[in-house]
Amino acid sequence: MFYDFVPQSRFLLGTAGYPSPQILQQAVMASESEIITVSLRREGSQGGAFRELLTQLNKRILPNTAGCHTVKEAVTTAHMARELFNTRWIKLEVIGHADTLQPDPFALVEAARILCADGFQVFPYTTEDLILGEKLLEAGCELLMPWGAPIGSGQGLRNIEGLRSMRLWFKDIPLIIDAGIGAPSQAAQAMEMGFDGILLNTAVARAQDPLRMAQAFAAAVRAGYDAHGAGLIERRDMATASTPIFGMAQFS
């Protein structure tokens, strides 16, 4: 599924911005996530203590290159993360615009090419653009992480038709919605469309009750995944009766 790992949970959770380390721990456990993301560039002066906390959680760590704006920054950060966390995994972010936090497609593909050649297993944060997706796969990526909406915006799936096209086009490629999810209903919607996972951070970390919100997202992701697997009925323009008319009384 995700390179050499097949998770039981399709919910990936970020570890930034929680009110306290204790609440972070509680939220991660409540989420049932097996994969957690961590930003090397945003750990700050307490990085050692934070990494110890992550170790105690006993989850698979997916380091990311959040905050990187150039190929050089992203590649350097990825190599540092591999040394610190002893993992080939890297969530590759190369930001092109400080306000929208939209990926720089050209730098993203170049960084992905370099890192894949260096033996990394790259999780690229991208858009729903099909050509960009193709270029990332050609660079060596084996999965894609399209955004639902700008990072931290909570807008949900802003371009549903584009994401649906992406799911149909890359039918055999794992696709994880990354960024923009603000409510459990939005996560369920993405999973119902056939996406393979949801990665989010802000919606849980900034919730009034992060633990309860983590539980809600876990349930929503699971429900959406099960619904897609069960087979949703086709949407219709007109009503169709669900109750048969056979055996009804006849009045004269």
Curated annotation (Swiss-Prot):
Record-linked InterPro entries: Aldolase_TIM (IPR013785), Thiazole_synthase_ThiG (IPR033983), ThiG (IPR008867)
EC number: 2.8.1.10
Reaction(s) catalysed by this chain's protein: [ThiS sulfur-carrier protein]-C-terminal-Gly-aminoethanethioate + 2-iminoacetate + 1-deoxy-D-xylulose 5-phosphate = [ThiS sulfur-carrier protein]-C-terminal Gly-Gly + 2-[(2R,5Z)-2-carboxy-4-methylthiazol-5(2H)-ylidene]ethyl phosphate + 2 H2O + H(+)
Keywords recorded for this protein, A-Z: Cytoplasm, Plasmid, Schiff base, Thiamine biosynthesis, Transferase
GO molecular function ontology, one term from the record: thiazole synthase activity
One Pfam assignment: ThiG
A GO CC annotation given for this chain: cytoplasm
Keyword Transferase: yes
Principal place of residence: cytoplasm
Subcellular location: Cytoplasm
Pathway of action: Cofactor biosynthesis; thiamine diphosphate biosynthesis
Superkingdom to which the source organism belongs: Bacteria
Protein residues bound to 1-deoxy-D-xylulose 5-phosphate: 152, 179-180, 201-202
Enzyme active site: 91 (schiff-base intermediate with dxp)
GO biological process, one term: thiamine diphosphate biosynthetic process
Family assignment from sequence similarity: Belongs to the ThiG family.
Function recorded in the entry: Catalyzes the rearrangement of 1-deoxy-D-xylulose 5-phosphate (DXP) to produce the thiazole phosphate moiety of thiamine. Sulfur is provided by the thiocarboxylate moiety of the carrier protein ThiS. In vitro, sulfur can be provided by H(2)S.
Assembly: Homotetramer. Forms heterodimers with either ThiH or ThiS.
Protein name as annotated: Thiazole synthase
Organism name: Erwinia pyrifoliae (strain DSM 12162 / Ep1/96)
Gene name as annotated: thiG
